[in-house]
Curated annotation (Swiss-Prot):
UniProt entry keywords in alphabetical sequence: ATP synthesis, ATP-binding, Cell inner membrane, Cell membrane, CF(1), Hydrogen ion transport, Ion transport, Membrane, Nucleotide-binding, Translocase, Transport
Function: Produces ATP from ADP in the presence of a proton gradient across the membrane. The alpha chain is a regulatory subunit.
Protein's UniProt name: ATP synthase subunit alpha
Family named by the database record: Belongs to the ATPase alpha/beta chains family.
Enzyme class: translocase
Transmembrane segments: none
Subunit-structure text: F-type ATPases have 2 components, CF(1) - the catalytic core - and CF(0) - the membrane proton channel. CF(1) has five subunits: alpha(3), beta(3), gamma(1), delta(1), epsilon(1). CF(0) has three main subunits: a(1), b(2) and c(9-12). The alpha and beta chains form an alternating ring which encloses part of the gamma chain. CF(1) is attached to CF(0) by a central stalk formed by the gamma and epsilon chains, while a peripheral stalk is formed by the delta and b chains.
Source organism of the structure: Solibacter usitatus (strain Ellin6076)
Lineage of producing organism: Bacteria, Pseudomonadati, Acidobacteriota, Terriglobia, Bryobacterales
Reaction it catalyzes: ATP + H2O + 4 H(+)(in) = ADP + phosphate + 5 H(+)(out)
Length: 512
C-alpha cells in the first residue's frame, strides 16, 4: 500500500484554492419572437440602448432600432435565415463601431469595416462609433482652403472648399462618379485621404472604380467602403455612416479627408425598406418621417475645425440620382437644402458631347468662393458672366433673329469657352494649367480660332508652357495669385504660342 503524505495533499489543495477564481458571466439576454426580411423582433432586452449592437447565434450581429413597450425591433447585419424563433440574444452594451486609422488606407472594406479585398486582416487599434454628434458651431471655422478637383468647370465656377458639403446631382449615366474619381485622382501628392462609399451599386461597377483608382495610383491614399446591391438593406444603411466615421478619424487628428457618398438616393431607399419592415408609419413617397434627419445628421459631420481643435477638415460630396431631371422630388430637395451648393449634371449636355455635363447656370457653390485661390477668382468672374450672356443670346438666336456684331462676338466667345471647359475623363488639371487656358479664353485669344481647333490649341498650349516656360507655371502654382508682373508673363506666353499655332494651322483655318 502506497504511503499517503498529508503535507503534499495539503499543499496541492492550498494551491488549487489559491488559483480558483470566482467569476460569474452575467449577460442580459432575450429571445427571438419572430424573424424575417432582415428584421428580428426580440422579447426580454429591457435595458437595451437605441443603436446598440446585439449578438445573435451563428455570429450574426444586429442593431436595436425600435424600442417598444414589450419588444425590441432589430435589423440583422448578416444572414437572417440562420436565426430562428426562440434563439437566445445577448446585449453587448456598446454602440456599433468601425475600425479606423492608417491601417485602412489602400483597402476595400464592407460597412462593418471588415476587409473584402482578399489582402488579409486589418490590424486597427482604434474604433469609432458610426453615429456621432457633429462638431458644434464653436468648434468650427469658415471654409477657407480650396479642395481642387482638377476639373476646369468646377474649380473655376463652382469651387469646393475643405470642410464643405457639395451635392453632385443628375440622372443616371451623366458622369457623376467620373467627377468624384477625378477629384480623388487630383489629390495625388497632396495631404488628403479620400474615402469612397459605394451604396447599392453593382459589384462589377465597384470593381471598375477600384481598378481606376489603382491604375492612377490613387489607392495609396484612398479607402473604399462597399455595401453592394446584393448586401442586405441594413448594410446599405450603415455604409455612409461607417465611411464618415473613418473620415472623422483623420479630421480629428489634424488632417484632411474627402468622403464621397455614391449615392444617397439608394441610401434613402434602403432606410425606407428597413423602416417599413419595422412598421414605422410612412410619409411622402413612402419614406419615413425622419429621412431628412437621416441625411442631415450624416452630412453635418463634414466640417472645417478651428485651430484649437487641430484645424482638420472633412469634406463631403454626396450624390443624388434624379429621375428624368426632376430635382423637385422629396430626397433631392432634402439634400439640396442640407448641402452648401450643388453641381447639376444634365443628360442633354452629356449626349451633346459636353463632358463633364455640368449645367453651370443652375449649379452653385455657396461657400466655396471664400476658399478659391486669388488667381482663379480673378479670372472666373469673367468666365461665369461670359457664359451667362452666351446662354441668354443662344436662346434668343434660335428664333433666327439678325444679331448685331457685339452679340455675334458674344455668341462666338461663348462657343469657344464651352469648348475649353470640356475635359477628358480621369485627366484632372493642375491649377496653373487651368489658369493659362481660362485666362486665354476670357481675354479673347481664342475668339478667332475655329471652335474645332480649341481642344488642340489647349493641349499644345500646355505642352509649350511646360517645355519653354516651366518657371512661370511654377510661379502661378506657388503664388496662387496673378499680380501685374505675372499676368504680363502669362500674356506673353499666350501671345507667343498663338502666333506659332496660327502659323502652323493656317491651312486648316483657311479651309474652315
Amino acid at each position: 500500500m502506497a504511503h499517503i503524505r498529508a503535507d503534499e495533499i495539503t499543499s496541492i489543495l492550498r494551491q488549487e484554492i489559491e488559483n480558483y477564481e470566482r467569476a460569474i458571466d452575467v449577460s442580459e439576454v432575450g429571445s427571438v419572437i419572430s424573424v424575417g426580411d432582415g428584421i428580428a423582433r426580440i422579447h426580454g432586452l429591457e435595458k437595451v440602448m437605441a443603436g446598440e449592437l446585439i449578438e445573435f447565434p451563428h455570429d450574426v450581429a444586429g442593431i436595436a432600432m425600435n424600442l417598444e413597450e414589450d419588444q425590441v425591433g432589430a435589423v440583422l447585419l448578416g444572414d437572417y435565415t440562420l436565426i430562428k424563433e426562440g434563439d437566445e440574444v445577448k446585449r453587448t452594451k456598446r454602440i456599433m463601431s468601425v475600425p479606423v486609422g492608417e491601417a485602412l488606407i489602400g483597402r476595400v472594406v464592407n460597412a462593418l469595416g471588415q476587409p473584402i479585398d482578399g489582402k488579409g486582416p486589418i490590424n486597427a487599434t482604434q474604433f469609432n462609433p458610426i453615429e456621432r454628434l457633429a462638431p458644434g458651431v464653436v468648434a468650427r471655422q469658415p471654409v477657407k482652403e480650396p479642395m481642387m478637383t482638377g476639373i476646369k468647370a468646377v474649380d473655376a465656377m463652382i469651387p469646393i472648399g475643405r470642410g464643405q458639403r457639395e451635392l453632385i446631382i443628375g440622372d443616371r449615366q451623366t458622369g457623376k462618379t467620373a467627377i468624384a474619381l477625378d477629384a480623388i485622382i487630383n489629390q495625388k501628392g497632396g495631404d488628403m485621404i479620400c474615402i469612397y462609399v459605394a451604396i447599392g451599386q453593382k459589384r462589377s461597377t465597384v470593381a471598375q472604380v477600384v481598378k481606376t483608382l489603382e491604375d492612377n495610383g490613387a489607392m495609396e491614399y484612398s479607402i473604399v467602403v462597399v455595401a453592394s446591391a446584393s448586401d442586405p438593406a441594413p448594410m446599405q444603411y450603415l455604409a455612409p455612416f461607417s465611411g464618415c466615421a473613418i473620415g472623422e478619424y483623420f479630421r480629428d487628428s489634424k488632417r484632411h479627408a474627402l468622403c464621397i457618398y455614391d449615392d444617397l438616393s439608394k441610401h434613402a431607399a434602403a432606410y425606407r425598406e428597413i423602416s417599413l419592415l419595422l412598421r414605422r408609419p410612412p410619409g411622402r413617397e413612402a419614406f419615413p418621417g425622419d429621412v431628412f434627419y437621416l441625411h442631415s445628421r450624416l452630412l453635418e459631420r463634414a466640417a472645417k475645425l478651428n485651430n484649437e481643435h487641430g484645424a482638420g477638415s472633412l469634406t463631403a460630396l454626396p450624390f443624388i440620382e434624379t429621375q428624368a431631371g426632376d430635382v423637385s422630388a422629396y430626397i433631392p430637395t432634402n439634400v439640396i437644402s442640407i448641402t452648401d451648393g450643388q453641381i447639376f449634371l444634365e443628360a442633354d449636355l452629356f449626349n451633346s458631347n459636353q463632358r463633364p455635363a455640368i449645367n453651370v447656370g443652375i449649379s452653385v457653390s455657396r461657400v466655396g468662393g471664400n476658399a478659391q485661390t486669388k488667381a482663379m477668382k480673378s479670372i472666373a468672374g469673367g468666365l461665369r458672366l461670359d457664359l451667362a450672356q452666351y446662354r441668354e443670346l443662344a436662346a434668343f438666336a434660335q428664333f433666327g433673329s439678325d444679331l448685331d456684331k457685339s452679340s455675334q462676338a458674344q455668341l462666338n466667345r461663348g462657343r469657344h469657352l464651352v469648348e475649353i471647359l470640356k475635359q477628358d475623363q480621369y485627366q484632372p488639371l493642375p491649377l496653373e494649367k487651368q489658369i493659362m487656358i481660362i485666362w486665354a479664353g476670357t481675354k479673347g485669344y481664342l475668339d478667332d480660332i475655329p471652335v474645332e481647333l480649341c481642344r488642340k490649341f489647349e493641349a499644345e498650349l500646355y505642352r509649350f508652357s511646360e517645355n519653354a516656360h516651366r518657371p512661370v507655371l511654377d510661379e502661378i502654382k506657388t503664388k496662387k495669385a496673378l499680380d501685374p508682373d505675372l499676368t504680363a508673363k502669362v500674356k506673353g506666353i499666350v501671345e507667343e504660342f498663338k502666333g506659332r499655332f496660327m502659323a502652323e494651322n493656317a491651312p486648316a483655318k483657311a479651309h474652315a
